[in-house]
């Protein structure tokens, strides 16, 4: 027989749509709760891509690619105006 998992302990991908509003309200939105969520996300990323037995540069490349895309999105407003210029 399957044991019933409380809604608070379910992961986001395990929550049904009708349970989603109550699941969101059960989350911890205090600064320490948000910091803990970021810490858990960082730990998951680090253990999955960086701290592996046969490590490669792919985990660091993903961070660098995200940085490049983020920087481009931030500077897009300035780059947009220089796109059609013929001369300096």
From Swiss-Prot:
Its BP terms in the Gene Ontology are: proton motive force-driven mitochondrial ATP synthesis; proton transmembrane transport
Q: Where in the cell is it found?
A: Mitochondrion; Mitochondrion inner membrane
Print the keywords alphabetically.
Acetylation, ATP synthesis, CF(0), Hydrogen ion transport, Ion transport, Membrane, Mitochondrion, Mitochondrion inner membrane, Phosphoprotein, Transmembrane, Transmembrane helix, Transport
For this record, an example GO cellular component is: proton-transporting ATP synthase complex
Q: What is this protein called?
A: ATP synthase F(0) complex subunit f, mitochondrial
Per the record's keyword annotation, is Phosphoprotein included, yes or no?
A: yes
User: Is the keyword Acetylation in the record?
Assistant: yes
Q: How does it assemble?
A: Component of the ATP synthase complex composed at least of ATP5F1A/subunit alpha, ATP5F1B/subunit beta, ATP5MC1/subunit c (homooctomer), MT-ATP6/subunit a, MT-ATP8/subunit 8, ATP5ME/subunit e, ATP5MF/subunit f, ATP5MG/subunit g, ATP5MK/subunit k, ATP5MJ/subunit j, ATP5F1C/subunit gamma, ATP5F1D/subunit delta, ATP5F1E/subunit epsilon, ATP5PF/subunit F6, ATP5PB/subunit b, ATP5PD/subunit d, ATP5PO/subunit OSCP.
Name the job this protein performs.
Subunit f, of the mitochondrial membrane ATP synthase complex (F(1)F(0) ATP synthase or Complex V) that produces ATP from ADP in the presence of a proton gradient across the membrane which is generated by electron transport complexes of the respiratory chain. ATP synthase complex consist of a soluble F(1) head domain - the catalytic core - and a membrane F(1) domain - the membrane proton channel. These two domains are linked by a central stalk rotating inside the F(1) region and a stationary peripheral stalk.
Native organism = Rattus norvegicus (Rat)
Residues with PTM Phosphoserine: 3
Q: Which residues carry this modification: N6-acetyllysine?
A: 16
Q: Which Pfam families match?
A: WRW
> What residue intervals traverse the membrane?
62-79
Give membrane topology per the record. Single-pass membrane protein
The N-acetylalanine modification is found at 2
